[in-house]
């Protein structure tokens, strides 16, 4: 269903079951845009043309996706979040509300929590732009900044309000400026590695999720 107040550009191709909410702008003169089966775009959102987007995209309200991104299957992106151009996003990635990413890479099953920013420019600013990477199954929690050129490893975890200025190795937690194996973190009802404990993935993702879980366990050996 396409809300009558939505603006759909002439270069846009929509699957039959796509839902577009009120006051959205879909497409632009930057190039063609296709939105596949299962896509839901909520109100006041803007998705520019020239993006490659897999099926099952689901957005919050007031999101912005600029041109030049490559986005995999079943991205969920929360209210007020922004993807600037040139980003790469894998399958089953979760971006919560009020996040921003510029030319970064979020690999399969990675998660970026509210208020976090993935940058493409080191501090102090320079003419060199480098992609930051969240590897498969990586979790960056609330109000973090991942500096350009940094990699957060497979199955790794970054605690809230952290500025990540150096690589976080695979299966490692960065909390209060200190690194340790993710298995040393314990909260009620949660055991690491992370991916198996999240429940918001469709059934078809489960075999890949289990393979990632096994990979993280092997990294901890």
Task: Walk through the language-model features, giving the residues of each.
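Residue-level recognition of the GNAT/N-acetyltransferase active site
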Residues: 3, 9, 15, 36, ...
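Glycine-rich hexapeptide-repeat left-handed beta-helix
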Residues: 1, 7, 12-13, 19, ...
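Extracellular beta-strand-rich, repetitive "passenger/adhesive" scaffolds
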Residues: 41-42, 140
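Extracellular beta-strand scaffolds
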Residues: 32, 41, 47, 64-65, ...
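Glycine/small-residue-rich loop that forms an oxyanion/phosphate-binding "nest" at active or ligand-binding sites
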Residues: 48, 55-56, 60-67
